[in-house]
């Protein structure tokens, strides 16, 4: 095996078993994650803590180039130079958390309904509710006053969390933000200023392209900060600073609670940045923190719309295509809504900035096209109403997600209006994510797809 490994090129995580050898297993890693699980008289090989969770609560992560020989008594780890090395055994807490679906049909449904609780846990880590101040759980190794530009890099749903954070950081901290999908960032040779901040977002902390982007940024001399759900992951271990989301294990392939917990962390970071840069007064900070504290309660209220959304899903399931529209921070949520629907129901869906409707998507509108409009009442609401009028004039079916004031102001005949609780527009994406997720979930249930493990998708994309 050692001789064969020396000839391999590219990324791999391998496990070898041998005929006639029931007490021998060999593993090797180069790129994708690989971990050793330690038990009593038993040893395991798996991708990460989630995979090994049902069997053991003690794991050692292999590093790139490592290979390991296991038997029931233990493991011997070698590095790329074939020298024996020690990799620390870490205790983790996912073993008991996987449990089951409780009374839910799918893990995704359970995870959607867990959001008020886990977002509340994440909130408590980043906000002092008594003083109404944001408190980072770790000391940041930089001063936001010295940061001239922020880059945010992620993939899939995490990139849409980053897109929302771009609005927050630019508005609250007056920091210019560049957003990239990791698969593009790592190859476009972006010039990064030494001492600026690069943020990387990943639920698993093992996303291959995001990890490669992190390594590129480190080589450029930027400060690196990761937002991850698995604090022992490769991205977490290689980042200068880690901000953990407290979503708990997320089993459904389509991310739900990890997304909203990422938003809570990023919102807290944006407020902290605004305060540090002198863009927010103490009164401003208190007002924003009060808004964050309300989010778990508002998410619980948003969940009460489920019976209405379940009914609507039966209509959506008859469609071949669905369009999602939003402005401001609702635009990234429109992208996320379209991604969720196509991921688990296999219905083609596209998300657009509402102002781009007349630049192409309007050609698709007819009586068969549902258009989901995400529009809390804010300073651009009237412009979004104008877009809805254009859709209605062409026979499109409008599904409006808004608050009570928005529902009263929008006099257009719509297929259905899903009324969300009243709240400020700044942090609305965390609450409006709930009906967006429920719509995708119930549509997929009607379609009869495998909601938790949709075809062709994996929970963690650990290869390019």
Where are these regions (language model features)?
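Short acidic loop-to-helix transition motifs that present clustered carboxylates
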Residues: 7-10, 52, 179-188, 206-208, ...
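Glycine-rich phosphate-binding loops that contact phosphosugars or nucleotide phosphates
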Residues: 145-294, 374-419, 439, 447
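Active-site phosphate/pyrophosphate-binding segments
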Residues: 6, 11, 115-151, 241-370, ...
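Short, glycine-/Ser/Thr-/acidic-enriched flexible segments
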Residues: 19-22, 32-34, 40-43, 49-52, ...
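Acidic/histidine-rich
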Residues: 11-42, 312, 317-343, 378-380, ...
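Conserved short alpha-helical segments that host acidic/polar catalytic motifs at enzyme active sites
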Residues: 1-101, 105-106, 114-148, 187, ...
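Generic C-terminus detector
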Residues: 82, 108, 397, 410, ...
